[in-house]
């Protein structure tokens, strides 16, 4: 449109999106035990493409879906406390880069901000797992509401993320 004078990307001031991965241009870079360095998300790639009109030589991995025991988020995943469960993420990468998978389970957010107010990062359950596999197994012994996150990193500075909420029941 010839009437468009330009565009810009902005940040509210701090993260307030219920999860550490929603609507981010870059992933976190200073979180204990997470091997993340502020890698670029697909939104950075999209903005570069829109602003330059050119395809990039390197692109972010594409997450096609994520399941826990074969169920997606829409299936209201429930797991019995102390039961081993298996998560799987389906990913493609246009350039066939080698991929690394970083998995973590966080408690579901309970401190919810409003209108851009600060929300603390939810508490982590267990250890961060780093692997070259798109499959992750773990168990949670304490009933409650949780969210499993995966960060899929290529070797070019891009990352894609997915998460799935689940409930652990007695």
Task: Report each predicted region and the residues it spans.
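Exposed beta-strand face motif in extracellular beta-rich ectodomains
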Residues: 144-148
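Short beta-strand edge segments in extracellular beta-sheet folds
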Residues: 165-170
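Short solvent-exposed strand-capping/beta-turn motif centered on an Asx-Ser/Thr pair
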Residues: 92-96, 143, 155-157
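Exoplasmic/lumenal beta-rich domain surfaces
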Residues: 100-137
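Substrate-binding clefts and catalytic carboxylate motifs of secreted carbohydrate-active enzymes
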Residues: 1-114
């Amino acid at each position: 449109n010839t009437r468009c004078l330009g565009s810009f990307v902005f940040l509210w001031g701090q993260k307030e999106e219920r999860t550490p991965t929603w609507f981010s241009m870059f992933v976190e870079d200073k979180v204990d035990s997470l091997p993340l360095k502020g890698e670029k998300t697909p939104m950075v790639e999209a903005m570069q493409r829109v602003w330059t009109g050119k395809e990039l030589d390197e692109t972010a991995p594409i997450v096609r879906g994520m399941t826990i025991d074969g169920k997606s988020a829409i299936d209201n995943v429930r797991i019995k406390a102390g039961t081993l469960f298996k998560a799987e993420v389906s990913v493609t990468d246009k350039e066939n880069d080698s991929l690394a998978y970083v998995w973590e389970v966080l408690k579901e957010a309970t401190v919810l901000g409003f209108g851009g107010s600060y929300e603390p990062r939810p508490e982590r359950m267990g250890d961060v797992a780093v692997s070259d596999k798109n499959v992750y197994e773990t168990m949670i012994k304490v009933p409650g509401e949780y969210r499993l996150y995966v960060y899929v990193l290529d070797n070019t500075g891009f990352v894609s993320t997915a998460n799935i909420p689940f409930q652990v029941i007695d």
